[in-house]
Amino acid sequence: MSWIEKILNKSNITQTRKANIPEGVWTKCDSCSQVLYRAELERNLEVCPKCDHHMRISARTRLATFLDEGATTELGGELEPKDILKFRDSKKYKDRISAAQKQTQEKDALVVMKGTLSGMSVVAAAFEFAFMGGSMASVVGARFVRAVEQALADNCPLICFSSSGGARMQEALMSLMQMAKTSAALAKMQERGLPYISIMTDPTMGGVSASLAMLGDINIAEPKALIGFAGPRVIEQTVREKLPSGFQRSEFLLAKGAIDMIVRRPEMRDTLASLLSKLTHQSQPGTKPIVAEFVAEPADVEADIQISTNKEDA
């Protein structure tokens, strides 16, 4: 090839450019590692369409997709945590609170809403796991009690979505006290005969699983949710035995009778609406009440006349 041909060949080379793909359009499943379209995943309520893995979801997103659109009122939103003990581990507690509030845009780890589900009045609460592992502390307990009080005042059911690592160690005994506090509040729901439905999501551990999460009239879990008091790694190190496959997962607990149902997240709203309509003896909007009709057959009518005639003759 001559020098002139080399120049001509170089001039014909076209420059290629990388396509500018905006960030956040694609994401990867934590379980199957498949690349997923972000918008499709959001439409599926953060459930992987490939392997059905239920990813973690924020408390407000959960309540927004669960309750009817429109009039919802937040309860206890003004309550904020305080560092009464001046607790410090590797970091000051007040600094941990500030960092969690900045990350999640929430004041604490529980969000409570008053609204409707398929037209039925309900009070719903959801844990925010991104806020210090959804740990239960004074404000969480106070907001949960506020939810119970509102349900009692409105004479309506209470629903709670749990996702927590347990009691918050930075508040010591005050966080442990919330176990008794929330349990006592739920006893009032039972006295009034109002339904309390507990939905356990991944993970529900520690003091939350040992109190409000397991006290539902109906205990429901999402698929493959980790539910228990101590984690499987801690148990294995303590008993020095290999735990069975799927130990502490929702399927394992259902087989052992520890929970009542496993419901996929996309089906949760319709399932709970159906359950509450039966528990509260309300018909869902758009459904016709069942009317039992009895039509007497001619033979039955004749038999009744014959029986009454015989009685008169006697």
From Swiss-Prot:
Instruction: Tell me its cofactors.
Output: Zn(2+)
HAMAP family according to UniProt: AcetylCoA_CT_beta
Catalytically driven reaction(s) = N(6)-carboxybiotinyl-L-lysyl-[protein] + acetyl-CoA = N(6)-biotinyl-L-lysyl-[protein] + malonyl-CoA
* Entry-linked InterPro entries: AcCoA_carboxyl_beta (IPR034733), Acetyl_CoA_COase_Trfase_b_su (IPR000438), ClpP/crotonase-like_dom_sf (IPR029045), COA_CT_N (IPR011762), Znf-ACC (IPR041010)
Family of this protein? Belongs to the AccD/PCCB family.
**UniProt-recorded name of the protein:** Acetyl-coenzyme A carboxylase carboxyl transferase subunit beta
Functionally, this protein is described as follows: Component of the acetyl coenzyme A carboxylase (ACC) complex. Biotin carboxylase (BC) catalyzes the carboxylation of biotin on its carrier protein (BCCP) and then the CO(2) group is transferred by the transcarboxylase to acetyl-CoA to form malonyl-CoA.
BP term (GO), one: malonyl-CoA biosynthetic process
The record's free-text note on cofactor binding: Binds 1 zinc ion per subunit.
Q: In which pathway does it act?
A: Lipid metabolism; malonyl-CoA biosynthesis; malonyl-CoA from acetyl-CoA: step 1/1
Q: Where in the numbering of this chain does the CoA carboxyltransferase N-terminal domain appear?
A: 25-294
Q: Which GO MF terms are attached to this record?
A: acetyl-CoA carboxylase activity; ATP binding; carboxyl- or carbamoyltransferase activity; zinc ion binding
Any idea where this protein resides?
Cytoplasm
Q: From which residue to which do the C4-type zinc fingers run?
A: 29-51
Coiled coil regions, renumbered to chain? none
* GO terms for cellular component: acetate CoA-transferase complex
